[in-house]
Amino acid sequence: MYKFSLILFLLSSIAFGQENENDTIIITKTYSQRWELNDADKNGTFRLMSYKPIYITAGRISSYPNKQPKSENPDYSATESSPYNNVEAKFQLSFKTKVVQDLLWGKGDIWIGYTQKAHWQIYNSDISRAFREINYEPEIIFRYPVKMKVFNGEFKSIGFAFNHQSNGRDLPLSRSWNRIIFHIGYEIDNWNITLNPWIRSSDSDDENPNITKYIGNGEINVSYNYN
């Protein structure tokens, strides 16, 4: 299935977090500032901040929309097709807040993150302009600052997160999974590089068999900081 996004307008262009798919963001803070790794950047706890990109696209075109979702687990395969349009809107909201500061020798922090992505059939009056899919992604994140110079740059942090993703649907359209995501942050000049490998948590009632074959076992995010 070939997809591309046409961004007609942005409610907000945010320079935080990771890049997803083909989203374009402008980085205004360094990796260290976004995660408050240095003492000078500490802002305390329970301050709501942007996390991943926040955006809205008025037009997203899919050549072959998934009208009848299927799974390798037969209990999670739709039995009927839905009359989805090829064009829909899409938006994402994402925030984080620090809940514990200065753990483990006064340096580690615990954050709570939440991301919600919606695919909206706003142009489809036949189904009352319903949401085709809404994905919810809460996570608990631990970050610990490090300073290790390598290749004229510096490793800035290590950490991990407990991540849950779900579409909040009932059978047979329910999709959810859990994983542990590891974080390694590196800065060189104005470039920020984050390596995020993950391990999937076992699930006795597997809704997504072999999901890592489709989305992989990690991601690398590269961003540039405009001074």
Write out the residue ranges for each language-model feature.
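Sec-dependent N-terminal signal peptides
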Residues: Y2-S13
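Outer-membrane pore/translocation modules
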Residues: Q68-A78, N85, V100-Y224
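Outer-membrane beta-barrel initiation region
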Residues: E19-N124, N135-P138
